[in-house]
From Swiss-Prot:
The active site is at residues 134, 236. This is o-succinylbenzoate synthase. GO terms for biological process: menaquinone biosynthetic process. Its EC number is 4.2.1.113. Pfam families: MenC_N, MR_MLE_C. The gene is menC. GO terms for molecular function: magnesium ion binding; O-succinylbenzoate synthase activity.
Length: 321
């Protein structure tokens, strides 16, 4: 006998979370829980405002229709909305025992605000020291100075930078001007520095700073090809689609010798623990980009190891099905 349940949830967010110039006061999403006999599987569906093509309401409609059809014995195709396809495919993978339990809970800590806050945490990190810095939110010159300071202060640090296409070519050059050329090889990559891929490629050629594709992966004309200066791709499964599509993209990138970073779209702790399992499975050599739980006021259903945030159980969820 099949049982499918759909829950809606809301978590308060840290006051400082701004996405695409809008403040995110709460994180809202859905869970699907599939049960068949003794087996069960969970998945998270949480479109990210300003980034996902679908709204939460659209995702909810598609999810409920799929869940009802599956419960009634059908094998419905995955919905087209990326977050819904991803969440359902994770629940199916858990149900079928296809999503390994081993997880990569290492985090590339997210440095936002004062770089002094990061020094102690990084200095205490065992093994590979990798951190992420969001750039493009302030003046490009300030960003360059902060990045230079971090690389100078911690000699074995590798930085991942994310500009979210914020810079014109001129601003990107202003940033690079303040990063000592001797340190630039320790910038693991800079995600999407400019508004167009062509400008980003030119930036890499002119500065020697490696770049990574993120938003580009979700554009219709994107193709996986080896390009000078491109070192990595960043895959956000909630924005990508089904687990199968994520696997295909990882395989295509690895075939070209590119690093692949599995990255958060600010999922709940349940979704983040699944992403940690996907990272351990598909990208075991690469620290994932999952350091977003601290932006939230609580965890849901499944806790992240060593997080001090309170954990809310199923009783805190709103049942829809």
């Amino acid at each position: 006998m099949r049982v499918s349940q759909v829950y809606r949830w809301q978590i308060p967010m840290d006051a400082g979370v701004v996405l695409r110039e809008r403040r995110l006061k709460t994180r809202d999403g859905l869970f699907i829980r599939l049960q068949e006999g003794e087996r069960e599987g969970w998945g998270e569906i949480s479109p990210l405002p300003g980034f996902s093509v679908e709204t939460l309401e659209e995702a909810q409609m598609a999810l409920l229709a799929w869940a009802q059809a599956w419960r009634d014995g059908a094998e419905p195709p995955l919905p087209t909305q990326p977050s819904v396809a991803f969440g359902i495919s994770c629940a199916q993978a858990e149900l079928g025992g296809e999503l390994p339990q081993a997880a990569d809970y290492r985090a590339a800590p997210l440095c936002s605000g004062d770089p002094d806050e990061l020094f102690a945490r990084l200095a205490a990190m065992p093994g590979e020291k990798v951190a992420k810095v969001k750039v493009g939110l302030w003046e490009a010159v300030r960003d360059g100075m902060v990045v230079n300071l971090l690389l100078e202060a911690i000699p074995d640090l590798q930085l991942r930078l994310d500009a979210n296409r914020a810079w014109t070519p001129l601003k990107a050059q202003q940033f690079a001007k303040y990063v000592n050329p001797a340190y630039r090889q320790r910038i693991a990559f800079l995600e999407e520095p400019c508004k167009t891929r062509e400008d980003s490629r030119a930036f890499s050629r002119e500065t020697g700073i490696a770049i990574a594709w993120d938003e580009s992966l979700r554009e219709a004309d994107f193709r996986f090809v080896a390009e000078p200066g491109v070192r990595a791709v960043v895959i956000k499964p909630t924005l990508t689609g089904s687990l199968q599509k994520v696997q295909q993209q990882v395989a295509a990138a690895h075939a070209l010798g590119l690093s692949v970073v599995i990255s958060s779209s600010i999922e709940s702790s349940l979704g983040l623990t699944q992403l940690a399992r996907i990272a351990a499975w598909l990208t075991p050599q690469t620290i994932p980009g999952l350091d977003t739980l601290s932006l939230m006021g609580a965890q849901l259903v499944r806790p992240w190891p060593e997080s001090a945030l309170p954990v809310l159980n199923i009783d805190a969820l709103e049942p829809l099905l």
